[in-house]
Amino acid sequence: MCIRDSAKPDGYTLMIGASAPQAINPHVYPNLNYDARKDFAPIGLITWLPYLFVVSPDNPAANLKDFLAAAKAKPNQLTYATTGIGTTSHLVTAVLLSKAGAAMVHVPYKGSSQAQTDIVGGRTTATFDTMVSSLAMVKSGRLKALAVSTPERVAMLPDVATVAEQGFPGFDMGAWLGLIAPAGIPPAIQDRLAREMNTVLADPTVRERLGDLGAQVRTTPTPAAFGAMMKNEYESWGAIVRDFNVKATD
């Protein structure tokens, strides 16, 4: 992530920024080798990554309401797997459980694959993970999706209701990816890159391909708009980290 010392801000060095390194990790890890607010210049938003709440196909819950009712009836007897402490998966689940008044035991993993495998194997109960990571398992029948985290249902899984539809109006959480550059890039180059990127993202073929992978194309009209979004995300995720007293373990 530390490109600020070696890369010239001339538009030839670009990178993908994401909600975790740009908005969450600065609040979880005290000794990062970059400053998410000062070291990078925004270009534009690329995609939003919906999260799917998934369980084993053997789980009797038909939807999120059923699942949360069971969790509330058995406090701290069900488990939720995540991709690690302080990850988006962890925080999104924590927010949902708090809103529902349900208590479950957190089981952090080092990634999606093992977390999903243990749900299939019955070692954990549920996980909230990106659609990109879990879509294939859902479509193959190895996992059952009970809810999607975005305000609207997703085209790839039209029968899966949103969290908002199931008792939590306004619920809209997920991860995002965007294009960023080293701080100091000339505004004219910054604006040109944003325009060119948005032209590509308007292509129906590109949008369809990203949709097939489980990502939603969301764009920002200008670098300034993306910068404002990143600032809001930084502050919002920081508040969540503080509310749940999330701290790095390594």
Each language-model region and where it sits:
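Short, small-residue-biased leader/transition segments that mark boundaries at the very start
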Residues: 1-3
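Hinge/capping helix and adjacent helix->loop/strand transition within the periplasmic-binding protein
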Residues: 5-13, 19, 27-114, 163-165, ...
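Conserved functional loop/turn residues at catalytic and ligand-binding sites
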Residues: 8, 47, 63, 108, ...
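Paired acidic/hydrophobic, glycine-rich loop segments that form the ligand-binding mouth/hinge
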Residues: 11-17, 125-129, 144-147, 237-238
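A ligand-binding cleft/hinge motif common to bilobed small-molecule-binding domains
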Residues: 22-31, 95-99, 126-160
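Short, hydrophobic alpha-helical packing/hinge segments within bilobed ligand-binding/sensory domains
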Residues: 115-116, 134
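An extracytoplasmic/periplasmic, membrane-proximal ligand-sensing/linker region
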Residues: 139, 162, 187-250
